Swiss-Prot record:
Matching InterPro entries: Ribosomal_uS19, Ribosomal_uS19_bac-type, Ribosomal_uS19_CS, Ribosomal_uS19_SF
Disulfide bonds: none
Phylogenetic lineage: Bacteria, Pseudomonadati, Pseudomonadota, Alphaproteobacteria, Hyphomicrobiales
Pfam families for this protein: Ribosomal_S19
Alphabetic keyword roster: Ribonucleoprotein, Ribosomal protein, RNA-binding, rRNA-binding
Organism: Beijerinckia indica subsp. indica (strain ATCC 9039 / DSM 1715 / NCIMB 8712)
Gene that this sequence comes from: rpsS
Name of the molecule in the record: Small ribosomal subunit protein uS19
Amino acid sequence: MARSIWKGPFVDGYLLKKAEAARASTRSEVIKIWSRRSTILPQFVGLTFGVYNGHKHVPVSVTEDMIGHKFGEFSPTRTFHGHAADKKARRG
């Protein structure tokens, strides 16, 4: 179920402050965040965030298509190593 429109999008407060500080500075550095639950807002377009996936910070460059999505959607937490091969078919 989607979030109520009257509540507005959820964004951690510290994230807005970090984004404003990054916009003010001319350096383009990765902003490390742990808030996978925060919604991507239009103010974040053009910035690069390091979204923590439980192991490392995955760099995510925010584009206009990402607005309204959550940061966690772009930083997978699980690694798929493939299914095991069928040993009976290989035996010959």
